[in-house]
Each structure stands twice: as structure tokens, then as C-alpha cells.
């Protein structure tokens, strides 16, 4: 039979062991880079598709850029929901998905946005 204080200590040790198994203490740089590439490889086709949609619809000026931010926020939200809030297991800073790659998809977006806008609405 255990003393109540010993039982508390055992419970604390079990909780610490569970927390250690859930949250990694260190991250492998190779895996972090691979996870960032995966996010980037998903974001670029989404940006291309968003630029094509913006060009076909006929957005111009500020509305086109606002549409890009809408597409970007939608992608990040869906990616976060898909991972069921376990992003801390794959990224040291889960906010990096939201802020680090905001410019990565901007150039393909602008390319397809202006290309399809010019083809459909100008010519």
C-alpha cells in the first residue's frame, strides 16, 4: 500500500512521461525542412489556382491582392484544421505556417492572375 504522497509522485511522473512522449524535446532539422517544403509545395499550386480564378473573374488592383490574402488564409486554416491542432509535433513554432510563407505563393499568383486577366478581359 502506498502513502498518498507517494501516489501523487507516481501520478506526476506518469503525467510527465506522457507529456514527454507527446511534445518532442528537440527537432531534427531535416524533418523541419521537409515539413516546410511540404507546406510550400501545397501552397504554390493553391496560389496558381487562386490567381487563375482571380484572372477569370476579373479582379483588378487591390481586389486581386485581397483575394490572394483570402486564398492564403483559407489554405492556412484548412491545413491547420487537417492537422487537428497537432502542429507543435511537426513545427517548432506552429505560427510559422501562417507567417513564414506568405510571400512564397505571391509571384505565381500574380503571374497567373495577370496572364488570365489579360487573355480573357483585354484581348
From Swiss-Prot:
Hey, which stretches end up on the Lumenal side?
Answer: 58-63, 120-123
- Keyword match Transcription regulation: no
Show the InterPro entries listed in the entry. Emc6, EMC6-like
Kindly list the residue ranges recorded as spanning the membrane: 42-57, 64-84, 103-119
Q: Name one GO cellular component term.
A: endoplasmic reticulum membrane
> Which GO terms of type biological process are on file?
autophagosome assembly; protein insertion into ER membrane by stop-transfer membrane-anchor sequence; tail-anchored membrane protein insertion into ER membrane
Q: Does the UniProt entry include the keyword Hydrolase?
A: no
* Cytoplasmic topological segments: 1-41, 85-102
Question: Which cellular compartments is it found in?
Answer: Endoplasmic reticulum membrane
Keywords (A to Z) from UniProt: Endoplasmic reticulum, Membrane, Transmembrane, Transmembrane helix
Q: Name the family the entry cites.
A: Belongs to the EMC6 family.
Q: How does it assemble?
A: Component of the ER membrane protein complex (EMC).
Function, as annotated, reads: Part of the endoplasmic reticulum membrane protein complex (EMC) that enables the energy-independent insertion into endoplasmic reticulum membranes of newly synthesized membrane proteins. Preferentially accommodates proteins with transmembrane domains that are weakly hydrophobic or contain destabilizing features such as charged and aromatic residues. Involved in the cotranslational insertion of multi-pass membrane proteins in which stop-transfer membrane-anchor sequences become ER membrane spanning helices.
Name the chain's protein.
ER membrane protein complex subunit 6
Give the species this sequence originates from: Dictyostelium discoideum
Amino acid at each position: 500500500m502506498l502513502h498518498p504522497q507517494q501516489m501523487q509522485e507516481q501520478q506526476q511522473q506518469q503525467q510527465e512521461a506522457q507529456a514527454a512522449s507527446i511534445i518532442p524535446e528537440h527537432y531534427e532539422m531535416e524533418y523541419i525542412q521537409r515539413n516546410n517544403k511540404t507546406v510550400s509545395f501545397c501552397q504554390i499550386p493553391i496560389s496558381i489556382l487562386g490567381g487563375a480564378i482571380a484572372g477569370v473573374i476579373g479582379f483588378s488592383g487591390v481586389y486581386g491582392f485581397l483575394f490572394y490574402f483570402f486564398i492564403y488564409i483559407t489554405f492556412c486554416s484548412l491545413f491547420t484544421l487537417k492537422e487537428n491542432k497537432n502542429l507543435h509535433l511537426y513545427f517548432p513554432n506552429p505560427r510559422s505556417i501562417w507567417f513564414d510563407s506568405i510571400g512564397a505563393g505571391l509571384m505565381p499568383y500574380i503571374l497567373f492572375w495577370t496572364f488570365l486577366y489579360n487573355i480573357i478581359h483585354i484581348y
